[in-house]
Amino acid sequence: MSQVKQIQGKALPLVGDDIDTDRIIPARFLRCVTFDGLGEHVFADDRQQQGGNHPFDLSQYQDATVLVVNRNFGCGSSREHAPQAIIKWGIKAIIGESFAEIFLGNCLANGVPCVTAPHGQIADLQQAITADPNLAVNLDLTTAAVTYGDRSFPVILSDGAQQMLLDGQWDTCGQLVQNQGKIAATAEKLPYLHWQTSAA
């Protein structure tokens, strides 16, 4: 199973409240058969409007693995394409003030932790990243804390989400594959799956 215990790397500050899923990935990109390639279209309209000055276009953030956002990130329609686009771009964790519930659940289902902290700590982190884009940001899920430079602050995520990530239980498909033997053994014991054999 894919355990998620710690994510460390460069970070990308995305300032603004109520950034919805239609901004994250515009509706015209939802017709894809697979999620492959969605990363290049993340924030497509915002990036076009800002003419190359959007944080997702700036060269200093191109290898960032941590996204730092503000309040109510991922609100709007419940499209799984939104977290998938962020993931395919290269983000592995999101730190913010708050998240829309469905977006948060979709991220968890893909092994991407979304943790929260008060506005002041998020703003300080965003400013620190802007001042030094090479700043290493570490999210430790075992201690539920973020560390950067000589600073550290606690973050919040539900006990259930934390345990799922630490144990690797977020990966439902992986669990099914890993437990195929147990599933088959249980199926053998269920009479309604073998009614034709029983009747004979």
Swiss-Prot record:
Gene3D superfamilies: Aconitase, domain 4 (3.20.19.10). It catalyses: (2R,3S)-3-isopropylmalate = (2S)-2-isopropylmalate. Keywords: Amino-acid biosynthesis, Branched-chain amino acid biosynthesis, Leucine biosynthesis, Lyase. GO terms for molecular function: 3-isopropylmalate dehydratase activity. Its EC number is 4.2.1.33. The keyword Lyase applies. GO terms for cellular component: 3-isopropylmalate dehydratase complex. Pathway: Amino-acid biosynthesis; L-leucine biosynthesis; L-leucine from 3-methyl-2-oxobutanoate: step 2/4. Coiled coil: none annotated. It comes from the Bacteria. GO terms for biological process: L-leucine biosynthetic process. Pfam families: Aconitase_C (PF00694). The keyword Chaperone does not apply. HAMAP family: LeuD_type1. NCBIfam families: leuD, PRK01641.1. Catalyzes the isomerization between 2-isopropylmalate and 3-isopropylmalate, via the formation of 2-isopropylmaleate. Heterodimer of LeuC and LeuD. Belongs to the LeuD family. LeuD type 1 subfamily. This is 3-isopropylmalate dehydratase small subunit. It comes from Synechocystis sp. (strain ATCC 27184 / PCC 6803 / Kazusa).
